[in-house]
Amino acid sequence: MASWALSAALLCLGGAFAYSELHSLSLREGSALGQATVPGPPEEEQPVTKDCGIAPLRGAVEGSRIIGGSQADTGAWPWQVSLQVQDGDILMHVCGGALVRDRWVLTAAHCTKEARDPLKWRAVMGTNDLTRSPYHSRNIRITDIIIPPDFIMETFVNDIALFRLKRAVRYNDYIQPICLPFGVFQKLDQNTACFISGWGRTREEGNGTTILQEAKVHFISREVCSSDQGYSGMIPNTSFCAGHENGTFDSCRGDSGGPLMCYLPEHSRYFVMGITSYGHGCGRRHFPGVYSNPSFFQEWMTHYLSQGNINRLFNMDIVLGQVLTALGSVILLGVT
């Protein structure tokens, strides 16, 4: 986060900087590595799933705590995932992610630029320190990567993806799913407790960190974010801005795909309101982080989250790394 800037990649795409890349930390396998309303399609309010958005080691009372760019306590964000790419016997942190079901991680589509083959990916959960593998952490292979067919890498339109775990993860105090914002109508302002977290750079030209960082942010109106001083109207309709106008807290390299999470007192839970997408540098004045809004993808996500085994949807031989367009998505399939 920048200024301390939470990291994500400066892949120079279309003049903007993506918040994901293979940062310099390499790990051996076994190591765990302005008021604004969130825009979204109209829908009827739905009951919130009970078993999500609760951090047992954090406590609901901390939902209003002000965090100013610091190391996260162990277990503070039990849905935080480190998505890592394997190169030989080395694992490297590339992007963050958010555990939303016991076999599904929500992240940013542009993260797949680093590796299209699902079998090169691992999801590390249950730890804040990527150099350690505590007993409660898990390292699970990825078997499928699902991307919207209308994702545009150059402009970050529809920058969202689902990674499917090879096996269901068992929840514990350090591993929990976060709630999806489907059917939640909430006007978010500077009094709403929203946070970002990740293992990215703590300043724009710095290195990634092995210890999970966290910071409190607030939503920034589209008018302010898209002004001539800022992004000049280039924010995708499926995205929004958050951070601080002066750049005090922001996401940066290595943070892509990580959650922007808000604590909603009426539900006593955390919700993933955004997925870290891109920004112009890290922590720069007038250029806050840009986040994909999961609410726009409710139908798309719900379809896949309800499926048991992706591979059974296709009556054909599955070839490693084959790209299929089906059921309204691009699916990168691996061998299970």
From Swiss-Prot:
Mark the transmembrane ranges: 313-333
Domain of life (superkingdom): Eukaryota
Q: What happens when the gene is disrupted?
A: Male mice are infertile. Decrease in sperm count and sperm motility, as a result of decreased numbers of pachytene spermatocytes, diplotene spermatocytes, round spermatids and elongated spermatids. Increase in the rate of apoptosis among spermatocytes accompanied by abnormal chromosomal synapsis and failure of double-strand break repair during meiosis in the testis.
Any one GO BP annotation for this protein: protein processing
Q: In which tissues is this gene expressed?
A: Exclusively expressed in the testis, from spermatocytes to elongated spermatids (at protein level).
Task: Report the locations given in the UniProt record.
Answer: Cell membrane; Cytoplasmic vesicle, Secretory vesicle, Acrosome
A Pfam family of the record is Trypsin
Predominant subcellular localization, coarse grouping = membrane
> Signal peptide: which range, if any?
1-18
Family of the protein in this entry: Belongs to the peptidase S1 family.
Q: What does this protein do?
A: Required for male fertility. Plays a critical role in sperm capacitation and acrosome reactions during fertilization, and also plays a role in the regulation of proteins involved in spermatogenesis. Regulates protein pathways that promote chromosomal synapsis formation, double-strand break repair, formation of the inner mitochondrial membrane cristae and apoptosis in developing sperm. Required for normal sperm motility and binding to the zona pellucida, potentially via a role in ADAM3 protein maturation.
The entry's protein name is Transmembrane protease serine 12
Q: Which organism is it from?
A: Mus musculus
Gene for this chain: Tmprss12
